Structure formats: C-alpha cells, structure tokens
Amino acid sequence: MIFSLYLIVAISLADLTAAQQECDCKNRFCFPNVVANWIGAAEYCSRNGWRLAILDTEEKQQQVEEQAQKVDAFKTNKVELWIGASDLAKEGKFVWHGTGIDVSYEKWIAGMPDNRNGNEHCVHLWYEPSRSFQWQWNDVVCSSTRRFVCERM
C-alpha cells in the first residue's frame, strides 16, 4: 500500500516537473502538458509564476497561434486550450482573469458566445480545421477539462 502511494506521488511529481519544464522557456506563452478545468488551469499557471493567457490584442493572439502550431501534441485534428477570459462574475460580461479588465479584442467563432444551457462561462481557443475553427474562441462549461495556455507576467 505504501509503495503504491509512493509510486503515485513519484509519477505525479514527474508529470508536474515535465509540465513545468515546458514553461521554463524564453517565449511569452507556454502550453503545460497538463489537463485541468478552467480554475485548475488558472491556479496551475499562477503557482508557477505565470497567468492564464490574456489575449487582449491581435498580436498576442497570433503569437499563441504560431507557438501552438509548433507543439507536437497539437498537430492533430482538434485542439482546445483554456485562455484567461470568463463571464463568471456577470453573465455576458467577459473579463480577463487576474486583472478584471473587460475583454475588448476578441476572436469568437461565429454565433459565440452563446452560453448554451445557461452554464458556459469560460473561454477556450478551438482549432478544428474540419469545422473551419482556426484558433477561435468559444464559451464552454468551466468544469470541463483541457490543456491551457499560460502567459509570462
């Protein structure tokens, strides 16, 4: 039993270390090899001296797109990544986590945000060429899990 516990801790620490190494780079943005819900993603970035990405300009959006296209794990048919926007405080008013600044620059998928079923409050980047989604934004349920983008502060 104790051996199993040590093994689980060792594996978890190895995963965390590998994920942290992906953020020990000179780039402004990083993509930890971690899957979390939106709050967990924000906490992970913060614990490691980063923040969930604030894509408040077209330039920052393009930087994330360019960097993401270089990540081997993202060379698939579908990628979804948390970013730091939500309307958790007030429905329909999207702000950047950590700053509280209103989202002004945006790159929503047509018809989004839609708050489907009344519980989509967190924003993710969505890349799925077969559906013509090219790193656009969508609102989704915050408790769903996916990888995410951290930004150096």
From Swiss-Prot:
Domain C-type lectin: 26-151
Cleavable signal peptide: 1-19
Tissues where the protein occurs: Expressed in female salivary gland. Not detected or low-level expression in female midgut and fat body.
Entry GO terms, CC: extracellular region
Disulfide bonds: 45-150, 122-142
The keyword Membrane is assigned to this record: no
Places the protein is found: Secreted
Role summary: Salivary protein with carbohydrate-binding activity; exibits high affinity for D-mannose. Agglutinates host erythrocytes. Probably participates in mosquito innate immune responses to prevent microorganism multiplication in sugar and blood meals. (Microbial infection) Agglutinates Staphylococcus aureus in vitro.
Name by which UniProt lists this protein: Salivary C-type lectin 1
Species this chain originates from: Aedes albopictus
